[in-house]
């Protein structure tokens, strides 16, 4: 966690959808990037379910159905996968509940469940302000406040310290309650406390930690329950213990329990406040307990003023939820202030990053042109942007810091991907190969701008910082379109390059270029693999990436892409120098042995970038980015350098959040293109027939001459794949001028089922002109969970 002075709170000021009314006594859980809020209230108790998508800044009200529970406050609320359990709470003043409801969030279906009572003893009585914690297939209920009076208007409070265990059924439903026999001194009765469960990674049993609460006075004690031995203990702690409190929140991220807000004792006298304020007040103090060392650390003290409104104001009865390493806080009660007959509640939503983000995946190539790359990487959750850098072995002219440039603003959101390497085998054992190096083929690529059906972010969020992304809309393109013809397995497509030789045995992966096409029935993966091609028998292909995309609305960006020569792998310790398009007249910038110069491409809001330029390093600098924090150089003061055709570049990317710039990804290598070879076949279709399947395609949109023939290949099972599943072996199943072929059931019986993403049979189709073979369209025919019979 950052030092107290470096905490970087963020208030979410831009969002869409129906915002829930401000409230207190509500609860929240997280399912992936969703924050789900239920209950609480101010002017009456709320009974609706609200969802906030932290990735799109969007509130929405799901259409729930089934046994919808009544509104409640100060209830138990836990999440097990995609199901949520609600227990107890106040349903109206003086009337509490002990009913249990289950919500299947995948269908927004409520169900009232009736667990069996304990073998000995009574089930939990109606209560509020209890803790309800999940670990494994069990929920643990502790404490709360009950009403001893049967008359809800005559409230007789009774504080509880009973302990129950609720066993869950897998997926849906519950088994029943039990009352574990515990050892040691039991914590005193209390309500509005917090309880979290934590288990050390290396060793140790899971432990439940209870902190604070209320039993006539606020508490600051910490209790530990070993869930294996059922032994209570009071661990000794170091550091400054937070003030006694209730109605606070406790959230676990890593090995830390973060405590925020709540009611605390009022320090000092203020004659302008009410008698209540002199006794208790809300706080915005923020601390964490290291659960491995039981040491408290204060991040924001109770006495720390906030004149700039740079963090959440004091509150109690709010909700807090951890999504990744980010904490979200919403609403809550603002002390004893009142508006008419209601409490004043906070309406704001805040978040705080607790750690720097992890390294993203390697940069992946979507498409390449003679002077640009369209690249992507896997999204990292809860980040604010990405720093993309490149490096090259070619020398370039060192830049002086007084040159200026006006960077463009660009950014596109893409979907997850997979990557692998591949081999191609001849039709028979007697086939041989002679590998030779020749000219580079040119490939033609297509990219897609995915447009989700919902508005993900406001327009102002398209790009976080200036970048060197460039528009490639002035180029031509091809599209790979997979359509499922019947109710058989789904299909997906990749674009890849095969050699000009028909009897190819070995293929070493190089680079890939991807594009996507929407369909309500198919998942499409497209990948272009660069080859060294010749008229003789042989090819060397180096496959870097593939891109998997789910159904979205798409537009086509048209560009030429280039299959590049094989790029020599250079380890991260290799020496590199920057380059220039023209012979430099100034001295070339040098790099110390064992170091590589990295130049910023820009900082991007989303996980894709169009790269046609980068920023030159000032003389004597190894990097222009301040990796230690989120501050970046003023790119307007730096000179830009265009990418050069036929040149290899290395890329790396790092994610940025409120704690700064995280570690960089592993290095990827790509090469700009050289024009001339045919594009990849497009509009691939697969349909079943009596012989097997019918495979058809459309000619390349840019043949760059006459198409002489097509070749189709099938990935087959071999012992080599069993040893290295990521390295596919292909057998040619068709060669000719027709744009279709039959794949027999006998051939399919030998097909390899690729499990790199979803199970699929893999085909490749490529076209040949006078220069040789261009990129191949790689087709993944999705098989569901069927491992053996693709035609069943």
Curated annotation (Swiss-Prot):
Span of the signal peptide: none
InterPro entries: FN3_dom, FN3_sf, Gal_Oxase/kelch_b-propeller, HCF1/2, Ig-like_fold, Kelch-typ_b-propeller
GO cellular component terms given for this protein: cytoplasm; cytosol; histone methyltransferase complex; MLL1 complex; MLL1/2 complex; nucleoplasm; nucleus; plasma membrane
Pfam families named in the record: Kelch_HCF
Location, primary (coarse class): cytoplasm
Region (Disordered): 399-447
Expressing tissues: Highly expressed in testis. Detected at lower levels in spleen, thymus, prostate, ovary, small intestine and colon.
Cross-link (Glycyl lysine isopeptide (Lys-Gly) (interchain with G-Cter in SUMO2)): 553
Organism field: Homo sapiens
Residue intervals of the Fibronectin type-III domain: 359-449, 583-675, 677-787
Kelch repeat boundaries on the chain: 34-79, 83-130, 207-255, 257-303
Superkingdom of this protein's organism: Eukaryota
Keyword Glycoprotein carried by entry: no
Protein name: Host cell factor 2
């Amino acid at each position: 966690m950052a030092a107290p002075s470096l905490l970087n709170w963020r208030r979410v000021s831009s969002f869409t959808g129906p915002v829930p009314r401000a409230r207190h006594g509500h609860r929240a859980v997280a399912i992936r990037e969703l924050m789900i809020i239920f209950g609480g209230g101010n002017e009456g108790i709320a009974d609706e379910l609200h969802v906030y998508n932290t990735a799109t800044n969007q509130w929405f009200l799901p259409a729930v159905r089934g046994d919808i529970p009544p509104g409640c406050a100060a209830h138990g609320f836990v999440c097990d996968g995609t199901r949520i359990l609600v227990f107890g709470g106040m349903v109206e003043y003086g009337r509490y509940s002990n009913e249990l409801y289950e919500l299947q969030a995948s269908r927004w279906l409520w169900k009232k469940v009736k667990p069996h009572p304990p073998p000995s003893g009574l089930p939990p009585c109606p209560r509020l302000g209890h803790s309800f914690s999940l670990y494994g297939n069990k929920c643990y209920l502790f404490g709360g406040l009950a009403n001893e009076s049967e008359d809800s208007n005559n409230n007789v409070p009774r504080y509880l310290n009973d302990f129950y265990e609720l066993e869950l059924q897998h997926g849906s439903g519950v088994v029943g309650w039990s009352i574990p026999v515990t050892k040691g001194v039991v914590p005193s009765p209390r309500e509005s406390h917090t309880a979290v469960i934590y288990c050390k990674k290396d060793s140790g049993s899971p432990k439940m930690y209870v902190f604070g609460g209320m039993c006539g006075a606020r508490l600051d004690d910490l209790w530990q329950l070993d869930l294996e031995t059922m032994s209570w203990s009071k661990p000794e702690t170091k550091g400054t213990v937070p003030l006694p409190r209730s109605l606070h929140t406790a959230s676990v991220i890593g090995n830390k329990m973060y405590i925020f807000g709540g009611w605390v004792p009022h320090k000092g006298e203020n004659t302008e406040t009410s008698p209540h304020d002199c006794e208790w007040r809300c706080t915005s103090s923020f601390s964490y307990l290291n659960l491995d060392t039981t040491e408290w650390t204060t991040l924001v003290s109770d006495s720390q003023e906030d004149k700039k409104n740079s963090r959440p104001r004091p509150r109690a009865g709010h909700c807090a939820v951890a999504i990744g390493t980010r904490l979200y806080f919403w609403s809550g009660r603002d002390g004893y202030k009142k508006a008419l007959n209601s409490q004043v509640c906070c309406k704001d939503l805040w978040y705080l990053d607790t750690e720097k983000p992890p390294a993203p995946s390697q940069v992946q190539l979507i498409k390449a042109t003679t002077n640009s790359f369209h690249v992507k990487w896997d999204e990292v959750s809860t980040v604010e942007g990405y720093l993309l850098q490149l490096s090259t072995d070619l020398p370039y002219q060192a830049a002086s810091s007084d040159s200026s440039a006006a960077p463009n603003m660009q950014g596109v959101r893409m979907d997850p991907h997979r990557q692998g390497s591949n081999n191609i085998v001849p039709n028979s054992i007697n086939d041989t190969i002679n590998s030779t190096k020749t000219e580079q083929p040119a490939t033609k690529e297509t990219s897609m701008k995915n447009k989700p059906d919902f508005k993900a972010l406001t327009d102002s969020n398209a790009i976080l910082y200036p970048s060197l992304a460039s528009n490639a809309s002035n180029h031509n393109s091809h599209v790979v379109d997979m359509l499922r013809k019947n109710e058989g397995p789904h299909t997906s497509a990749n674009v890849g390059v095969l050699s000009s030789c028909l009897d190819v045995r070995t293929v070493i992966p190089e680079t890939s270029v991807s594009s996507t096409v929407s369909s309500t029935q198919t998942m499409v993966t497209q990948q272009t693999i660069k080859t060294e091609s010749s008229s003789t028998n042989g090819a060397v292909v180096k496959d870097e990436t593939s891109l998997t995309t789910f159904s979205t609305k798409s537009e086509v960006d048209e560009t030429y892409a280039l299959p590049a020569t094989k790029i020599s792998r250079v380890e991260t310790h290799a020496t590199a120098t920057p380059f220039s398009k023209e012979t430099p007249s100034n001295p070339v910038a040098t790099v110390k042995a064992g170091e590589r110069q990295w130049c910023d491409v820009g900082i991007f809001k989303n996980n894709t970038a169009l790269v046609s330029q980068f920023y030159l390093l000032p003389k004597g600098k190894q990097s222009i980015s301040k990796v230690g924090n989120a501050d970046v150089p003023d790119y307007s003061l730096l000179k830009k350098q265009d990418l050069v055709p036929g040149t290899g570049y290395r890329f790396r990317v790092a994610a940025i959040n409120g704690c700064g710039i995280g570690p960089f990804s592993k290095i990827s290598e790509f090469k700009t293109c050289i024009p001339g070879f045919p594009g990849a076949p497009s509009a691939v279709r697969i349909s079943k027939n009596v012989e097997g399947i019918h495979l058809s395609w459309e000619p390349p949109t840019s043949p760059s001459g006459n198409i002489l023939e097509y070749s189709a290949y099938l990935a087959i099972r071999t012992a080599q794949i069993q040893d290295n599943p990521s390295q596919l072996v292909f057998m040619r199943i068709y060669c000719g001028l027709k744009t279709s072929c039959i794949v027999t059931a006998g051939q399919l019986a030998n097909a390899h089922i690729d499990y790199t993403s979803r199970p699929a049979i893999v085909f490749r189709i490529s076209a040949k002109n006078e220069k040789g073979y261009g990129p191949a369209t790689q087709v993944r025919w999705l098989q569901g969970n069927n491992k053996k019979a693709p035609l069943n």
